[in-house]
Amino acid sequence: MSIKSDKWIRRMAQEHGMIEPFVERQVRGADSSRVISYGVSSYGYDVRCADEFKVFTNIHSAIVDPKNFDEKSFVDIKSDVCIIPPNSFALARTVEYFRIPRDVLTICLGKSTYARCGIIVNVTPLEPEWEGHVTLEFSNTTNLPAKIYANEGVAQMLFLQSDEACEVSYKDRGGKYQGQTGVTLPRT
């Protein structure tokens, strides 16, 4: 398995629609103001967070159960910023829609800008032939409120290409998150 370069990422996005919308260079500023970078980097793609958030709340004193998840555990927010309460959690989604090739596994890592502020981004691997908007999980590990910026970089995708295509892809087995759009809650 080898990590793929900016040239490969650019080609796959432009010729095969692997990432849409696609930004073919790294953006660090917009309209004379600094932003948290997004777009193609040397060996990855920095994704942006859309302006749709679900912030974890304890208003209804629900129990967090991944097999029987109560949507009332979240408050929906549509904004250019999201404030995550101390020691809490929020979900969002990428601006970008992904179509992962059959011989590629994609790993997502949080950006250091957020990690150095105590904000952890978690995403499980994007499996071969998975497609959709990526649901992003943000954990605020601090005892202070934390801010997430929509339409700016939040995580980096690394593309690992195998020597051979897998026998059974995510699409083949009818994965439960295939084709997801919007912020997607747990499914069983």
Swiss-Prot record:
The keyword Nucleotide-binding applies. CDD domains: trimeric_dUTPase. InterPro entries: dCTP_deaminase (IPR011962), dUTPase-like_sf (IPR036157), dUTPase_trimeric (IPR033704). Coiled coil: none annotated. It holds the Pfam family DCD. The active site is at E137. Catalyzes the deamination of dCTP to dUTP. Belongs to the dCTP deaminase family. This is dCTP deaminase.
